[in-house]
Amino acid sequence: MLAVAVLAAGKGTRMKSALPKVLQPLAGATLVERVLASAKNLQPERRLLIVGHQAERVEQTLEHVNGLEFVLQSPQNGTGHAVQQLLPVMEGFEGELLVLNGDVPLLRAATIDALVQGHRSSGADVTLLTARLADPTGYGRVFADTDGQVSNIIEHRDCSEEQRGNNLTNAGIYCFNWAALAEVLPQLSNDNDQGELYLTDTVAMLPRAMHLEVDDPDEVNGINNRKQLAQCEGVLQQRLRDYWMDEGVTFVDPASCTLSEDCRFGRDVVVEPQTHFRGCCSIGDNSKLGPGTLIDNASLGDRVEVVQSVVREAKVGDDVSIGPFAHLRPAADVGHGCRIGNFVEVKKSSLGAGSKVNHLSYIGDASLGENVNVGAGTITANYDGVNKHQTVIGDHSKTGANSVLVAPVTIGDHVTIGAGSTITKDVPSKALSIGRARQMTKDNWANRSI
């Protein structure tokens, strides 16, 4: 059996944030959510989150995670003290305990799996993850033989000059035999500079300790401040971009674009500079996005082009052109072959196949049929000050420039709305509707004061 415990009780003072450190966002998910996800493939029998600082807020944020047990550490008195809190709740448990840190979000699932499998095959009481760092300053040094058996872990401040030449460091991630760990946890001492109980001290107390060296040191980067958060964001973004480039996506300027792990791209997609993807996005084959574009929780079909625009919580069909400077807001549904032009906003509206809104328009709470042509400056006036109302425009209808459709109103099929009209009543199919003041011209007006 396997239990996974995530240490998430720390305050994160150096973040200088009202938000607990483990709830800081990284590529669309919190740090601790990423840590939990990294161990998901192991299918542990128990998952425990050790909480402390703002425990209630952390629990509320993660209440959607099925089967997650919360264990309170109060006060926060070190990593060893944190794991001591598991003693009563894991009484009678038989198996391994994997200990992860809630602020180390870049661990790959394959690395964690290798740690657990290596621990099981070695017969060790504890196996710890290690990394060789170019600059190990501040990290505890791990001393081990060529077979991987650990003899000692010495904190940086306690190392001699010779010992500091060893760049094999402790990543703070462990796989224990729970029964062996449970015996030594009560023996931990706080006789150290910080007056805390260190989980590291259990390694020397257990008969057999092994280590597994991680191939990529970036995996064990911890986050204590905003700079480190940004560095980890950069590593994760590069992983995502590399993956999708290997899958047939072109990033013209990769470093200027950001993704979420819930993005899905078809083949031969081209992403121009300064284009960003948030949340769950689906992009069809042969689409071209950007530059200067945001796609947020949206679904785009094949051969879609979006230029310098925002598409948020919207659905876009095949062969659609959007932008520049268009804004598709939540519940916009744009059909096959549509055109959304410059300075157009669409909200909670559907556009049938082939419809066009080319310039300077607001389409809100509306249903447009197929092959509708919306003239420049057309507005659906959907709000009466209290409630929103719907505008319906039938197939093959067109509105003249600078028209206002005052909802609720229904425009039939094959209707023409004259330019400059304000339409307040329904218009039957095949009609021409003009609702504007009659033009009046007064000759010699300029001479009136002479």
Swiss-Prot record:
Its cofactor is Mg(2+). Pathway: Nucleotide-sugar biosynthesis; UDP-N-acetyl-alpha-D-glucosamine biosynthesis; N-acetyl-alpha-D-glucosamine 1-phosphate from alpha-D-glucosamine 6-phosphate (route II): step 2/2; Nucleotide-sugar biosynthesis; UDP-N-acetyl-alpha-D-glucosamine biosynthesis; UDP-N-acetyl-alpha-D-glucosamine from N-acetyl-alpha-D-glucosamine 1-phosphate: step 1/1; Bacterial outer membrane biogenesis; LPS lipid A biosynthesis. Residues 248-450 are annotated as: N-acetyltransferase. It catalyses: alpha-D-glucosamine 1-phosphate + acetyl-CoA = N-acetyl-alpha-D-glucosamine 1-phosphate + CoA + H(+); N-acetyl-alpha-D-glucosamine 1-phosphate + UTP + H(+) = UDP-N-acetyl-alpha-D-glucosamine + diphosphate. InterPro entries: Bifunctional_GlmU, GlmU-like, GlmU_C_LbH, Hexapep, MobA-like_NTP_Trfase, Nucleotide-diphossugar_trans, Trimer_LpxA-like_sf. CDD domains: GT2_GlmU_N_bac, LbH_GlmU_C. The active site is at H359 (proton acceptor). Pfam families: Hexapep, NTP_transf_3. Keywords: Acyltransferase, Cell shape, Cell wall biogenesis/degradation, Cytoplasm, Magnesium, Metal-binding, Multifunctional enzyme, Nucleotidyltransferase, Peptidoglycan synthesis, Repeat, Transferase. It is found in: Cytoplasm. UDP-N-acetyl-alpha-D-glucosamine binds at residues 7-10, 21, 73, 78-79, 140, 155, 170, 224, 329, 347, 362, 373. Acetyl-CoA binds at A376, N382, Y383, A419, R436. Its main location: cytoplasm. It is an enzyme of class 2 (transferase). Residues 227-247 are annotated as: Linker. GO terms for molecular function: glucosamine-1-phosphate N-acetyltransferase activity; magnesium ion binding; structural constituent of carboxysome shell; UDP-N-acetylglucosamine diphosphorylase activity. Its EC number is 2.7.7.23, 2.3.1.157. Mg(2+) binds at D103, N224. Binds 1 Mg(2+) ion per subunit. GO terms for biological process: cell morphogenesis; cell wall organization; lipid A biosynthetic process; peptidoglycan biosynthetic process; regulation of cell shape; UDP-N-acetylglucosamine biosynthetic process. One of its GO terms (cellular component) is membrane. Residues 1-226 are annotated as: Pyrophosphorylase. In the N-terminal section; belongs to the N-acetylglucosamine-1-phosphate uridyltransferase family. Catalyzes the last two sequential reactions in the de novo biosynthetic pathway for UDP-N-acetylglucosamine (UDP-GlcNAc). The C-terminal domain catalyzes the transfer of acetyl group from acetyl coenzyme A to glucosamine-1-phosphate (GlcN-1-P) to produce N-acetylglucosamine-1-phosphate (GlcNAc-1-P), which is converted into UDP-GlcNAc by the transfer of uridine 5-monophosphate (from uridine 5-triphosphate), a reaction catalyzed by the N-terminal domain. This is Bifunctional protein GlmU. The lineage of its organism: Bacteria, Bacillati, Cyanobacteriota, Cyanophyceae, Synechococcales.
